[in-house]
From Swiss-Prot:
Disulfide bonds: none
InterPro entries the UniProt entry points to: ATP-grasp, ATP_grasp_subdomain_1, D-Ala_lig_Van_CS, D_ala_D_ala, Dala_Dala_lig_C, Dala_Dala_lig_N, PreATP-grasp_dom_sf
Cofactor note: Binds 2 magnesium or manganese ions per subunit.
Origin superkingdom: Bacteria
Catalytic activity, EC: 6.3.2.4
Phylogenetic placement of the source organism: Bacteria, Bacillati, Bacillota, Bacilli, Lactobacillales
Function: Cell wall formation.
Protein name: D-alanine--D-alanine ligase
Reactions catalysed, as given in the entry: 2 D-alanine + ATP = D-alanyl-D-alanine + ADP + phosphate + H(+)
Compartment(s): Cytoplasm
Enzyme class: ligase
Binding, Mg(2+) 2: E301, N303
Organism this protein belongs to: Streptococcus equi subsp. zooepidemicus (strain MGCS10565)
The keyword ATP-binding is annotated on this UniProt entry: yes
Amino acid sequence: MSKQTLILLYGGRSAEREVSVLSAESVMRAIDYTKFFVKTYFISQTGQFIKTQEFSSQPAATERLMTNATIRLEQQIRPSDIYEEGAVVFPVLHGPMGEDGSIQGFLEVLKMPYVGTNILSSSVAMDKITTKRVLESADIPQVAYTVYIEGQDLDRCLAETEAVLSYPVFVKPANMGSSVGISKAESEEELRAAILLALTYDSRILIEQGVLAREIEVGLLGNTDVKSTLPGEVVKNVDFYDYQAKYIDNEITMAIPAAIDESAMTSMRTYAETAFKAIGACGLSRCDFFLGQDGQIYLNELNTMPGFTQWSMYPLLWEHMGLSYAELIEELVRLAQEMFEKREGHLI
């Protein structure tokens, strides 16, 4: 039986490229090589596509993957050269230019099936402010928030925020993930500084009410027939679950399933599936919730390309549901092919 060619894109132009490399390495080691032939391409910070490694069998545990030594500039190609008839692309890319609809549009122009959400749902979910407004229309509970857009009167925004929210608040670039550029503010001075920091990553800034809450996550998988996992909990050993805690200091553990009552579990899964459909998603997503001390549930965000590292919540959630990492990848490829055929059919 001939193998399916799977093309992995990793790296990327965003500040989350290091997470992409970690995710791609984990995917490479989890793939079932009896079913897939794998080609990998690195996207540099300046947007160059560089052909890196190919594997027809399981790489040795000692073999170094996705390292600088595997990236040779003389292997640079035109982006369109990744095209291969019948291949499926797995864009293991996080953040802007990865999960905001950009790479999805490029792959649709190339007429290639790809893992993950489509152009529209990727771009909607990437922008935290737009996501908030879409989820409001679906009657999904969220924490109170205000918005600052670069060029607006900052002092007026500070006054409006203090009138609506109470400290602490969290300040987030609208178009970043992996906690990049996010700050906690407990005073007007800190809020001003946090907004200025966030503006170095994006021109649209979300300011959210801080809540004393547990962080609960639900995995989603499917196209029109989306399925959800039991919720898992991010158990933090730090005050704020930032990029350093997530990916460098490893200051978190996962509790799967989360120790919450059945009613909260059911509500979160229902909200997650509703949110997935509200943004028109397909393939996969991870839905993140806050569970307040009073039992109130708030949907925090939808992540359309969640982390795929060996310690990331998304693959662990599905493993708990009985779907191994290798089986998860196989199902994602199947869903990609299904959506590709549907898209192509709509063009006829």
